[in-house]
Amino acid sequence: MIYENAPAKINLTLDTLYKRDDGYHEVEMIMTTVDLYDRLTLEKRKDKKIVLKIEHRYVPNDHRNLAYKAAELMIERYNIKCGVTITLDKTIPIAAGLAGGSSDAAATFRGMNKLFELNLSLKTLAELSSEIGSDIPFCIYGRTSLCTGRGEVLEHLPKPPSCWVILAKPEISVSTQEVYSALDLSQAHEQIENEKCRRAIEAGDYLEMIRTLGNRLETVTIEMHPVIQMLKETMMKAGADVAMMSGSGPTVYGLAAKERQAKSVVNALKGCCKEVYMVRMLG
């Protein structure tokens, strides 16, 4: 039996450069992980079935689930002769811009590597995982990274300066595909400061880092769901140092240097948002 944690991610930056011939967008973004986890247990089966056990009415337990796809790909690629039971304890909000599904898949790749004693490197797992999802290679490592290409080309960075992270997920779900479809790059004038953010992280400069956060998709998702702007404003009024949407949304995160600031933000959000988490960066 193998246990794996699957941490959520947040985007410190996210820029979309152009739409590629393969239909994906070329991106440049800095992501890190936070200590909000799904937890997976993996056990060998005597038969050849993949059984995904999960008690969540909105999360599928078949090939529509990335963790299931990861198990399927590992069994096929490495000619594994038996099946696997994966028990998934879900904590990360779904369709939230926190890569919960991708992180579950990454944990499945890592877990099956251990369970079946394949001795594959993280680099090999990351390359394999890119076949089923663009964020999964990042989640394989779980380290702060500058991500390019579809998101699968990684350059690892140091852990960001220490701070508190407040996550607020409104009672809506967002389709990443829908957000990208609505993105008009000809109208995208905001400068996303990836290089400045990177340098701030490398220097351990918190104040410079928060000045350089940015998300190209934020205005698109806010137009669809104004509650995101309301959450950002609530966080800032309550004392957050910065507030930003993660990924394609709808989760908004705030950063706070001090614990009392973070607690003030959490208290301010309680009246308007059911899913609020106060966490730390792992990266």
UniProtKB/Swiss-Prot annotation:
* InterPro entries the record matches: GHMP_kinase_C_dom (IPR013750), GHMP_kinase_C_sf (IPR036554), GHMP_kinase_N_dom (IPR006204), IspE (IPR004424), Ribosomal_Su5_D2-typ_SF (IPR020568), Ribsml_uS5_D2-typ_fold_subgr (IPR014721)
Q: Does the keyword ATP-binding apply?
A: yes
The answer to whether keyword Disulfide bond applies is: no
Binding site residues for ATP: 93-103
* Keywords in alphabetical order: ATP-binding, Isoprene biosynthesis, Kinase, Nucleotide-binding, Transferase
Q: What is its EC number?
A: 2.7.1.148
Residues at the catalytic site = 9, 135
Record GO biological process: isopentenyl diphosphate biosynthetic process, methylerythritol 4-phosphate pathway; terpenoid biosynthetic process
One example of the protein's molecular function in GO is: ATP binding
Instruction: Identify which top EC class this enzyme belongs to.
Output: transferase
Could you tell me what reaction this enzyme catalyses? Answer: 4-CDP-2-C-methyl-D-erythritol + ATP = 4-CDP-2-C-methyl-D-erythritol 2-phosphate + ADP + H(+)
Q: What pathway is this protein said to act in by its record?
A: Isoprenoid biosynthesis; isopentenyl diphosphate biosynthesis via DXP pathway; isopentenyl diphosphate from 1-deoxy-D-xylulose 5-phosphate: step 3/6
| Protein role | Catalyzes the phosphorylation of the position 2 hydroxy group of 4-diphosphocytidyl-2C-methyl-D-erythritol.
Q: Which family does it belong to?
A: Belongs to the GHMP kinase family. IspE subfamily.
Q: What is this protein called?
A: 4-diphosphocytidyl-2-C-methyl-D-erythritol kinase
Q: Which organism is it from?
A: Macrococcus caseolyticus (strain JCSC5402) (Macrococcoides caseolyticum)
The gene behind this protein is ispE
